[in-house]
Amino acid sequence: MMHESQIKDAARPDGTYKFDTYFTHIQKYLDNSDLNIGNMEFTLAGKPYTGYPAFSAPDEYARHITDCGFNVFLTANNHICDKYGAGMSRTLKIYRELAQSDSIAFTGTAGNQEEFEQTTPLILVRKGIKIAIINATYGTNMGPEKPWPKINYLKD
């Protein structure tokens, strides 16, 4: 999650955000793991950046999480629609960009049927072991306006 106080603490005078102190206490574990999974319980909906109750974190936060070694993002959660369908779509766009440049993967939400089929379940192979990851949520605080982008629900 990314609360208002965290956003303010990370803000720099030039308008950027720096999260370099995040995860320092667990970095040695991240560095020595083959698979690091993060529950991304916020959107990357763009400005204005907000905390509770409708989360929208700076894009730099997702980049920092990736740089720390997280390589799987779980995206289905009650906050994924905090900025409605447009915010969720922008979040997926950022995750796709990270997936192309940094070999991260995500599951739990999808922009279309093809993406849904590729990520649900998310199948990964690490050291010759095949791993299936399924991510779903009980619901969202603000429902999606249409069938796509799709959210995996527990009832599905």
What are these regions (language model features)?
Residues 1-156:
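Acidic, metal/ion-coordinating pockets
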